[in-house]
Design a protein with these regions (language model features):
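Acidic, low-complexity cytosolic segments
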Residues: 1-32, 41-147
């Protein structure tokens, strides 16, 4: 079994701030089970307490993939930017929302969750802490800074 997630080294917000906010979101919104903030390339920035490290990383990778596919569809069909992506499963709902520049907020809900309320609370969280949710893009072709 994996140990609980501790993303302290990856955060752009002060230690614990994103985790606390994600835990609060999961506790307040009926049906929510998990929440994760991720960079657009799928790195975990913050995660709710009930997620193991392995599960947080898996959810972030899945959310990044769906969000990227939706952005590609938006570009191809000239439909504009992606605000939200939703995947409805037999007993769960995955919602991914753009959150700041280069980041996403992904939540996993039971199928009993109120999608409208979940989306509303996600938007409130993103608005409240948008500057903390921004994740700088990784530059692949740039050499590491010397210090």
């Amino acid at each position: 079994m994996s140990e609980p997630w501790s993303p302290r080294s990856l955060k752009t917000a002060p230690p614990g701030e994103l985790d606390w906010l994600l835990d609060d979101l999961v506790a307040r919104v009926r049906g929510l089970r998990h929440a994760v903030v991720l960079s657009n390339d799928g790195l975990v920035v913050g995660a709710s307490d009930a997620l193991t490290r392995e599960d947080a990383e898996h959810l972030a990778a899945v959310a990044s993939g769906f969000h990227s596919l939706a952005k590609g569809a938006g570009r191809h069909f000239r439909a504009g930017g992606v605000r939200q992506t939703m995947v409805e499963m037999d007993v769960g709902i995955l919602i991914i929302a753009a959150a700041g520049d280069g980041a996403c907020l992904a939540v996993l809900s039971s199928s009993a969750g109120d999608v409208g309320m979940i989306a509303y609370e996600m938007a409130r969280l993103v608005t409240r802490v948008g500057e903390h949710l921004a994740a700088p893009p990784r530059l692949r072709d740039q050499p590491p800074a010397s210090g």
